[in-house]
Regions:
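Active-site helix of classical SDR
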Residues: 95, 137, 145
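C-terminal substrate-recognition "lid" of short-chain dehydrogenase/reductases
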Residues: 195-219, 224
Length: 228
């Protein structure tokens, strides 16, 4: 197993725990992604599985008015582009480069060469106030799932996407307990945050189930996000 991440300390610790290798990679950098794949393949060989999880977000309205001063501002285009570059272009960059590597492998007995799982979000379908960039990036990941699966079908490479709801991630771990509890209570059932092992179980199912291809699946406890 090889882990790509921008957080070197956390990445090295997790790679050690899992018995894998760590490569410091910024998915917006062509050079770093290329170097990451080269280092990973030198250490463990050409991958047959890729799971893309890199992502970031912000909360800025398309245009807004300051309640105190009346000043009007719009979403900074540079901030919008940063979200697109990390979430969408970074996902596609890693997908394309991994698929090209998988194509060099001999097919397995069932004709398969590899499987790719990308990560979108329920915000792809239930975007909230201030999430224009984030929702656009995640909706685009959903939108490109089937075309990429069709691009790669002749090479025996499957592509699927997970749309997680509210998960217990390091980002949420820093929130006050009352906020975390309110988020958990907003989930229809079960009334709790999603757990990383539940994401992993669905990703594993997508990877190991040969007939599963070109699909985007919500994993969200039946939540439908409110406007805010």
């Amino acid at each position: 197993m090889a882990l790509f991440d921008f957080n070197e300390a956390a990445g090295l610790a997790l790679a050690k725990e899992l018995g894998g290798v760590f490569c410091k990679v910024d998915v917006t950098s062509e050079e770093q992604v290329d170097a990451g794949f080269a280092a990973a393949r030198a250490a463990i060989g050409q991958e047959r599985v890729l799971v893309n999880c890199a992502g970031t977000g912000n909360a800025i309205k398309t245009a807004s008015r300051d309640k105190a001063t009346g000043a009007i501002r719009h979403f900074p285009i540079a901030a919008f582009d940063r979200i697109i570059q990390i979430n969408l272009v970074g996902t596609f960059r890693c997908t394309a480069k991994s698929a090209a590597g998988m194509m060099t492998l001999p097919p397995l007995a069932d004709g398969e060469r590899g499987a790719i799982v990308n990560t979108a979000s329920v915000a792809a379908q239930d975007g909230q106030i201030g999430q224009a960039a984030y929702s656009a990036s995640k909706a685009a990941i959903v939108g490109m799932t089937l075309p990429i699966a069709r691009d790669l079908m002749g090479e025996g490479i499957r592509v699927n996407t997970i749309l997680p709801g509210i998960f217990d991630t390091p980002l949420l771990a820093g929130l006050p307990d009352n906020v975390r509890n309110a988020l958990a209570a907003s989930v229809p059932f079960p009334k709790r945050l999603g757990q990383p092992d539940e994401y992993a179980a669905l990703a594993e199912f997508m990877i190991t189930t040969g007939y599963f291809n070109g699909e985007s699946v919500r994993l969200d406890g039946a939540i439908r996000m409110a406007p805010r």
